[in-house]
Every structure is written in C-alpha cells, then in structure tokens.
Design a protein with these regions (language model features):
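Beta-strand-centric surfaces of beta-sandwich/beta-rich domains
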Residues: 1-168
Length: 169
C-alpha cells in the first residue's frame, strides 16, 4: 500500500537457471520500479522501496524447495550500492542448478502505490577459471547479547578469533 508499515523478512528462492558451475567476477543488484523520474524526494531512499537485503546462493534440492549443501554469501544489497568486484584470484562460486535465497529484506513504504523488483547482474570469469584463494570467514560475537545504550557516544563492541593458518586479509 501507499502508506503502511515496513516489511521485514525472507522473500524466498529464485532459481538462476545455470547448468554449470561458474565463478563470479562481479555482481550488481539494482531496483527497477515505477516511480516517475520527475518525482522529487528529499532522500535517495525516497526513490526506492527496497532499503536493503541479504542473499546467498546454493544448489537447489531435487524438489526445488530448499538449498542443499554449501552456500555462497553475497554482499548485501542496499540503496546506493555500486557493483561489487571480486579480486582476480578470488572469484565466488555460483553453482549449477542453484537459486538465490533472498533473505533479510527491508521493503519500505514511500507514500505512493509502487511496484518494483530487483535485477541481479553477474559477470562471470571464463569457463575453466579456478580461484587461487578461497573465501573464508568466521562469525564473531553474539548478536543477541549486544547491549547498545541509547544516547551514549563512543560505545564499543570487541570480538576476537584466532586464525588457524596463514591468512591473506
């Protein structure tokens, strides 16, 4: 609706149609909507309905209802974000028979009836490309127990992990 609460949540799975594994060199996500170009807005967010969204990809189950096995996490989509380029020696894998899992989305009301969707653009490395480095990451901290006090400057949160092998950061 033109005026209503923001929507937060999972959008679901979108099959990619890929028939072979491909490594991604760059990705861009952009919103396409029916907001007229001549409509004024006091913020860039007023021109869009998707504020941000996290997403991942992985091979679809046989019945196409879920992602099975390892998944690839992609950079968050957010208003004003440019394309993400991955280092030459560290492309990310988009698997054959995969789907994008559109997760934590935040869609907001902009005061007018608006229809919109997201388009995903992938630039692939040539067939046969194998990355020299693999992407890794450790989940640090505990988001449940973070206590941010209102109206208090200079708050800090520390979280540490020991690397188990030589790592390029």
């Amino acid at each position: 609706p033109a005026v209503g609460p923001d929507r937060w949540g999972d959008i679901g799975l979108v099959p990619t149609g890929l028939t072979v594994d491909r490594y991604v060199e760059a990705i861009e996500v952009r919103e396409v909507n029916d907001i007229p170009a001549d409509v004024e807005s006091s913020t860039v967010g007023g021109r869009y309905i998707f504020h941000h969204m996290t997403f991942s990809s992985g091979a679809l189950s046989e019945d196409g209802t879920e992602i099975e096995g390892p998944s690839t996490r992609w950079p968050i989509h957010e208003v004003g974000r440019n394309a993400d380029l991955f280092p030459e020696k560290a492309g990310r894998l988009l698997r054959a028979n995969s789907a994008l899992h559109l997760r934590a989305s935040h869609v907001h009301s902009n005061g007018r009836e608006t229809t919109g969707h997201l388009e995903f653009g992938f630039k692939f490395y040539p067939l046969g490309y194998e990355p020299e480095y693999r992407r890794g990451g450790a989940l640090l901290g505990n988001g449940v127990d973070i206590d941010v006090k209102p109206n208090l400057a200079d708050q800090e949160f520390h979280s540490y992990s020991v690397l188990s092998e030589h790592t390029k950061i």
